[in-house]
Amino acid sequence: VDTGRLPAPEQVLELIRARRSNRALTPRPIPDEALQRIVEAARYAPTASNSRQVSFTLVTEPEQLLRIADFTVGVFASTARKLLHPVVRTLLKPLRPDLYRYASRFAEIEREHEAGNDPILRRATALLIIHTPASNRVGCEDANLAYQNASLMAESLGVSQIYMGFVLTAARMGRKNAFARIAGITGRPQAIMALGIPAFRYLKYTER
């Protein structure tokens, strides 16, 4: 370890504070070298028992990105129609109000998607899918440790990164292995990062 090249604590904290989920993305592609550095940073994250059962898949083909967005919207649209059916809503909402937190938003997402907007990927030009074997009991924890490494590396490279919670939720709600086939992965997706060149850089910190 070359300790002389390690950043000062103040520099590390500066990077952490500067990292924000900038959803204003441009269509410019991310250089391959930057993408590889992001993946490399993710690979160096620790894993439980040093099992290293974490895999990383980059998706950069526009058609495949669109299929992932279509899949996500389709899962949510189907769910929204079921939840918002008058009979179902009357019976279920008093018992499970938590299910209705995003029901209206799901329908809105479908309308935005059909209008040609991109409410899911935000016009990201790449997705980093972090996945683990289904048998890995701590796969989620391992994957999200790797995600944070990748996120900070992306920030240092001037690449915006957005946690794809909607895509991850749809992958879990959809038919078994449907997302895995579309995304070209094995195992279970545990964390998904959208990546893109930002239209601008934030000049102020956000208070936490």
Descriptions of predicted regions:
Residues 1-208:
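Acidic, surface-exposed loops and disordered segments
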